[in-house]
Amino acid sequence: MSEVKVGKNESLDSALKRFKRSCQKAGVLQDIRKHEHYEKPSIKKKKKSEAARKKKRF
């Protein structure tokens, strides 16, 4: 969980930017999107092998 403490002279906008940046670095949104819908294990394997094949080709 990302946590940001707001300083005395810090604006809310800059604190929000820091929070968004820390969430992006932690991969929170990617994890939420990944778990948004259930994927069968066979489909996970298929996607993983396709990604490896694409990566190997380039």
Curated annotation (Swiss-Prot):
Keywords recorded for this protein, A-Z: Ribonucleoprotein, Ribosomal protein
Record has Ribosomal protein as a keyword: yes
Ribonucleoprotein is among the record's keywords: yes
Pfam families the UniProt entry points to: Ribosomal_S21 (PF01165)
Matches recorded under InterPro entries: Ribosomal_bS21, Ribosomal_bS21_CS, Ribosomal_bS21_sf
GO cellular component: ribonucleoprotein complex; ribosome
UniProt xrefs under PROSITE patterns: RIBOSOMAL_S21
Ranges in coiled-coil conformation: none
Chain residue ranges for the region called Disordered: 28-58
UniProt xrefs under Gene3D superfamilies: Ribosomal protein S8
Bias-annotated ranges (Basic and acidic residues): 31-42
A molecular function (GO) term: structural constituent of ribosome
Alphabetical GO biological process terms: translation
Domain of life: Bacteria
Compositionally biased tracts (Basic residues): 43-58
Family classification: Belongs to the bacterial ribosomal protein bS21 family.
PANTHER family: MITOCHONDRIAL 28S RIBOSOMAL PROTEIN S21 (PTHR21109), SMALL RIBOSOMAL SUBUNIT PROTEIN BS21 (PTHR21109:SF22)
Name of the protein this chain belongs to: Small ribosomal subunit protein bS21
Lineage: Bacteria, Bacillati, Bacillota, Clostridia, Eubacteriales
